[in-house]
Amino acid sequence: MSVEVRIPTILRTYTGGEKIVTAEGASLQELVANLDSTYPGIGERLLDESGLRRFVNVYLNDEDVRFLDGLGTEVADGDSVTILPAVAGG
């Protein structure tokens, strides 16, 4: 299943500057693993030992995956995943 993944500026060093890449997988977990095999190092920027990093937001077709099934969220051919780093300020 081919899924379009939108990469934030801060992570484009891993994708050779590409803003949009494609990845394969039946779940978000598989998709991240596929991204990391194609773009080594990107996985550790997205995940920690407990799952998605706290300050990384991931959206599947504009739905926050934290309110779906997290890393177990199923993805389908033609879906769109957007990765956004959380922004904090004071």
Feature roles, as predicted:
Residues 1-89:
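Ubiquitin-like/PB1-type beta-grasp interaction modules and other compact soluble beta-rich domains
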